[in-house]
């Protein structure tokens, strides 16, 4: 499987575990807590697999960037976190950085 696709899946699992952390209420909800731990482990495993082919700095930055963008977007959509011009510009800057890293890797 393509290392970039694996890395994207790892990033999406990072978003899943971040949301799981929010819903687990400090790991006091067992089912959601198990989901969260599985997502954490899966995210780390996939990141590790992607590192067989991708440079560490690039892969880590993309992985974190996907997590930041995904969790920020879900925070705005699900929990009414602030939506303002500078927040959107910052998210777009992260996205452009991810695209730049992909194009230069």
What residue ranges belong to the model's regions?
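Polytopic alpha-helical membrane proteins, predominantly small-molecule transporters/carriers
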Residues: 1-105
